[in-house]
Amino acid sequence: MFRKLSVEFLGTFWLVLGGCGSAVLAAAFPEVGIGLLGVSFAFGLTVLTMAYAVGGISGGHFNPAVSVGLAVAGRMPPASLVGYILAQVTGAIAAAAVLYVIASGKADFQLGGFAANGYGEHSPGGYSLTAALVTEVVMTAFFLLIILGSTHSRVPVGFAPIAIGLGLTLIHLVSIPVTNTSVNPARSTGQALFVGDWAISQLWLFWVAPLIGAVIAGIVWKIVGDDS
């Protein structure tokens, strides 16, 4: 179990450092920067690369919602959930801390949103609480369905990380304007702790909505999937 939790920590660390790091450090540099498209691909690439690197050890969850969804679908023992989630959250916080140290080394650094997730006035596009809730539930549910389907025994071995990484890229392309894209409570927690204030007060949604989406996906997969 120690090896599994260690790589969940490392995988989540890489997801936050690579994904949020691209948003904080490179999205607008130089001038236009990598923009929404680049940030979306960065998040997808972090999952793709670490799924290949360490997915064979822990399953490559890197996300509390993924762990919960897999448990509901019967793909992992519920007793492992607490350990996985703690490893993921601590990995995200550690990555946010490293990113803060790097970003604050720039003379004109301003904390701003620090890639935190938000709704209302803190939504990149000014979307409401309801829009944010629906977006996070639906996007997380489909992310889990992609994971559950692509890792099924019927699917050729070795292709799942590609489908999952591209799926996460697509999710970011759609939902960055709405919530800055969470679908991952650990990722949201790390950034919120450094932003504080509004990011902390809105953090509940980025736990509740992804977990609801994950549970829905797990139940749907038990109905339409074929894990027997």
Curated annotation (Swiss-Prot):
GO terms for molecular function: water channel activity. Gene3D superfamilies: Glycerol uptake facilitator protein (1.20.1080.10). The keyword Cell membrane applies. Pfam families: MIP. It catalyses: H2O(in) = H2O(out). Signal peptide: none annotated. Aquaporins contain two tandem repeats each containing three membrane-spanning domains and a pore-forming loop with the signature motif Asn-Pro-Ala (NPA). Channel that permits osmotically driven movement of water in both directions. It is involved in the osmoregulation and in the maintenance of cell turgor during volume expansion in rapidly growing cells. It mediates rapid entry or exit of water in response to abrupt changes in osmolarity. This is Aquaporin Z 1. It comes from Rhizobium meliloti (strain 1021). The lineage of its organism: Bacteria, Pseudomonadati, Pseudomonadota, Alphaproteobacteria, Hyphomicrobiales. The gene is aqpZ1.
